[in-house]
Amino acid sequence: MSHHSNRKVEVRRVDECTTMDELIRHCFPAFGGAFLRRIYTILDQAVGMGCPISVAVAGPVTVSGQHQAWLIPLLETGWIAYISTTDAVCYHDGHRSLTEHKAGPIFEVPIWGDDGALRDERTIRVTDMAFDEDVLLDQDKFLSAVLTHPDFQHKMTGTELRYRLGGIYGRQEQRSGVKPGLLAT
């Protein structure tokens, strides 16, 4: 019994594809293409059947605004039901809500820029996103004050902590007039 299909490798040029489905199914034949097609197929079937998805998210998701571009909309539509993420993602989620920085604390910098010059300017770089060092200092002050509230003065799980922080962040975002962040969603 053969364990392979002998499927002929036929690819299309990307400019010949009109949909994401065609692109994924016909333009990535090797070196991870099979994995990408399999993941795409599973997700396409799950979403098509109405099955909620669980995702693990790391990296500069909230710094770069990806949470507002795709993660929150997928949560709100029910396509994603559960998120596992890092403390850094949750920490950076609060930057835009800070009163002192509501005008937009995060800006783009060259990914291969001069880190020494950025350090001298007191600029923190996260890949190609950056913010003034004061954003971190103000975030620390904000969180330190929040964590002294009575609601935070007992043992709790990380899930409860993030839920409670989400409520605080949500109220702060409303006061600052900024879009809701990940924890407030």
Stretches found by the model and what they are:
Residues 1-185:
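Metallocofactor- and cofactor-centric catalytic cores in central/energy metabolism, strongly enriched
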